């Protein structure tokens, strides 16, 4: 009988209907990935030797010149920035003085500023912002041209297709890459949540990005504390010199042999996955859920595409005919048995994302939504519930 560690600790398990959010554990690893990690844990190896083989295999799987495993996408942004600064000076990052680092510049679109860019800010390089986070005065190529100078070490770009939560106003990735190429400036793309589709693992770098960073613990379904960097061999020579297990910046971002092997196993499965079958399953479950509530005057189920992260994967919202009820619905979902975790879509709707769910979990969510509908009806009739 397997050990129930969460029960021992008194931590309640949840059905994750929100998606691959870090705050709820990202995604679930497959048994194959778990077995690979356990196998890696049973023996010891020389980390650099394992790292080289894993990175080589990941580069091949993702059709890139090079790859590197980090302990998360945010760590990948920091390592990428440090590597670009080191490349700019032609010296290892730990050998640079604070004054040299502070003189180097990294360009960001104002429309792309977000809490994740702390990975860039903590480098202590100068952040140069361009454009505005709206379409009143859209950013043009000249804005980027004027921002580039002899101190520019890199351009960071937050990639999200239309429909996601990123503000409008930035240059397209294509135009950004074109300007950067004219000046020989590396472009680092933050695409942490941008699989699916699997093709993004090679299309973004194929378009010209020097480094592209993905989360390993989101839809790739690798270890939660893992990230995947892919890109061009020339810049990755600096990443290898900067990242773990090198002393300096890289030492802060340790990656265990279990995470390296686990992420490799996850990527092997992901690129071989039948994405069309998975998409059809999600569409069928959404259609089935909508049918369950066709006769309800209180709840309607709506299909959303793409999802709020801009991913080309369908999800649904449960909308209640009760203004301002979303927080109460979230509370009732969390307090139910089983506990269900999700997020509000607006003041009277909540998300249910099939991406992280199994059939039996969707069934349980539908049952609980009907129970909440009953609770609201009883309250509306003044009954003590």
State the predicted function of each range.
Residues 5, 294-368:
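Conserved C-terminal alpha-helix-loop-beta "cap" of PLP-dependent enzymes
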Residues 269-275, 350, 355:
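Glycine-rich phosphate/diphosphate-binding loops and the adjacent beta-loop-alpha structural elements
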């Amino acid at each position: 009988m397997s050990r129930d560690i969460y029960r021992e600790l008194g931590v309640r398990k949840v059905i994750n209907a929100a998606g691959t959010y870090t705050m709820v554990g990202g995604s679930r690893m497959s048994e194959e990935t778990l077995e690979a990690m356990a196998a890696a844990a049973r023996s010891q190896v020389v980390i650099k030797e394992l790292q080289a083989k894993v990175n080589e295999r990941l580069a091949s799987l993702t059709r890139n010149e090079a790859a590197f495993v980090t302990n998360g996408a945010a760590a990948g942004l920091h390592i990428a920035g440090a590597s670009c600064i080191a490349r700019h000076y032609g010296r290892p990052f730990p050998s640079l003085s604070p004054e040299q680092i502070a003189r180097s510049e990294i360009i960001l679109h104002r429309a792309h500023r977000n809490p994740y860019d702390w990975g860039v800010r903590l480098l202590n390089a100068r952040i140069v912002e361009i454009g505005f986070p709206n379409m009143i005065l859209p950013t043009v190529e000249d804005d980027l041209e004027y921002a580039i100078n002899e101190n520019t070490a890199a351009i960071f770009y937050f990639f999200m297709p239309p429909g996601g939560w990123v503000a409008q106003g930035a240059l397209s990735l294509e135009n950004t890459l074109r300007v950067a190429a004219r000046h020989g400036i590396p472009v680092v793309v933050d695409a942490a949540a941008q699989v699916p589709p699997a093709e993004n693992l090679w299309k973004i770098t194929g378009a010209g990005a020097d480094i592209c960073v993905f989360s390993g613990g989101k839809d790739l379904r690798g270890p939660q504390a893992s990230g995947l960097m892919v890109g061009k061999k020339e810049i990755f020579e600096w990443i290898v010199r900067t990242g773990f297990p090198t002393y300096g910046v890289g030492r802060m971002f340790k990656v265990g042999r279990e995470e390296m092997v686990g992420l490799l196993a996850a990527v092997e499965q992901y690129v071989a996955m039948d994405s069309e079958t998975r998409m059809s399953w999600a569409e069928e479950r959404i259609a089935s859920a909508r049918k369950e509530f066709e006769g309800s005057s209180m709840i309607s189920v709506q299909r959303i595409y793409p999802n709020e992260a801009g991913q080309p994967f369908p999800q649904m919202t449960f909308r209640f005919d009760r203004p301002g009820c979303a927080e109460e619905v979230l509370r009732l979902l969390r307090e139910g048995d089983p506990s269900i975790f999700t997020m509000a879509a607006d003041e009277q709707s909540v998300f249910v994302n099939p991406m992280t769910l199994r059939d039996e979990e969707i069934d349980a969510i539908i049952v609980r939504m009907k129970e909440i509908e009953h609770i609201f009806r009883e309250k509306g009739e003044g009954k003590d519930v």
